[in-house]
């Protein structure tokens, strides 16, 4: 009986220790302001980013995409909008009006040269605008809805490409051939686990760059589950990754960020971890204990930090926090929780962190962008 009691006490102590460990992440004090930007309503804020002058860019899902019908094609467009604000929050202009790629917002980023990049999961494109909003580069291709005529008097064969990133048929898009990309629908992405290489995407989720200007696209919301690398001119170089839970495998990539040392941090949401790679795709380490990473960001400055949001279900009040992490993987602290009030978060899909204490976060479920200031 005494032996059983000792075992019970030991097990209880282990459980208590685990509970204490789980609660040992320090809380970071912070302030937040959701009323800075002048537009009254965005819709779902999928992306928020700032440039070196303090201007704020918001890429939001403002409504269902419209369909323009033609004799041969149906074009889906207009489901999202990209807004620019000055440092005081005053609306400056809208960027990308009428651009074919703007359909279903997924992310916006600003590179070191102040170019503005959007990632669109509906058109399966990554688009670069210069600092003045002029279109400079397009990666990927939006599959068309085309009526193919097979000959005089022959019935038409319809290639149907639905809007907002849903699966297309295997024939749609440039990526149908072997060794090309996901094209934009599940049919072109191949069976789960294949990680098909190429320069087309299947619902891309994020983009980042290294110091040489190479471009890295997280091709992660479809079933490609890979990172695609391009030169700064937009030429495809290589890709790595496939569906799975091992090193270098992914289960829904929701974000990617790079630090000055060339490390790439990949939010592997389905596996509840952040994987770290070099620029050639060599696995280096992984970070766990941070929930389900949704949005990630690496701060500037002499001592960079990684920020990662814990994705929360719309009805959940158990998480939704943002973690502050050293590049070594050490968790410094966390702040925030799920909710709709100021200083609470409703699925943070975007984090901008020019410094370690001044952040912007974009929220899907609360339809807003909050400016967050961490207290020193």
Model-identified regions with their sequence ranges:
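Positively charged n-region of N-terminal signal peptides that target proteins for export
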Residues: 1-4
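Bacterial N-terminal signal peptides
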Residues: 6-19
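Eukaryotic scaffold repeat domains enriched in small/polar residues
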Residues: 21-376
């Amino acid at each position: 009986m005494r032996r059983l009691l000792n075992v019970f006490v030991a097990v209880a102590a282990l459980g208590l220790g685990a509970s204490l460990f789980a609660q040992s992440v320090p809380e970071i004090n912070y302030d937040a302001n959701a009323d800075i930007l002048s537009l009254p309503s965005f819709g779902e804020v999928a992306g928020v980013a700032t440039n070196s002058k303090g201007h704020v860019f918001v890429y939001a899902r403002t409504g269902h995409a419209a369909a323009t019908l033609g004799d041969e094609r149906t074009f889906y467009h207009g489901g999202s909008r990209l807004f620019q604000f000055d440092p005081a929050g005053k609306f400056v202009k809208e960027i990308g009006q009428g651009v074919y790629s703007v359909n279903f917002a997924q992310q916006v980023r600003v590179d070191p040269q102040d170019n503005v990049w959007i990632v669109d999961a509906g058109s399966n494109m990554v688009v670069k605008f210069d600092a003045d909003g002029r279109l400079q580069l397009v990666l990927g291709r939006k599959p068309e809805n085309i009526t193919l005529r097979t000959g005089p008097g022959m019935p038409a064969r319809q290639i149907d490409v639905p809007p907002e990133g849903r699966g297309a048929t295997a024939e749609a898009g440039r990526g149908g051939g072997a060794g090309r990309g996901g094209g934009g629908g599940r049919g072109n992405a191949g069976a789960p686990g294949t990680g098909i290489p190429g320069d087309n995407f299947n619902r891309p989720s994020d983009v980042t760059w290294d110091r040489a200007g190479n471009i890295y696209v997280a091709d992660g919301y479809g079933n490609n589950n890979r990172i695609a690398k391009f030169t700064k001119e937009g030429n495809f170089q290589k890709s790595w990754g496939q569906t799975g839970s091992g090193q270098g495998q992914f289960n829904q990539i929701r974000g990617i960020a790079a630090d000055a040392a060339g490390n790439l941090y990949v939010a592997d949401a389905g596996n509840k971890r952040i994987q770290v790679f070099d620029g050639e795709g060599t696995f280096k380490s992984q970070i766990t204990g941070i929930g389900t990473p949704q949005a990630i960001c690496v701060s500037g400055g002499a001592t960079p930090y990684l920020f990662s949001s814990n994705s929360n279900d719309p009805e959940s009040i158990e998480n939704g926090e943002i973690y502050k992490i050293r590049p070594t993987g050490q968790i410094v602290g966390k702040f925030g929780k799920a909710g709709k009030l100021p200083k609470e978060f409703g699925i943070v899909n975007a984090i901008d962190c020019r410094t370690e204490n001044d952040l912007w976060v974009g929220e899907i479920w609360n339809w807003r962008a909050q400016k967050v200031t961490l207290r020193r």
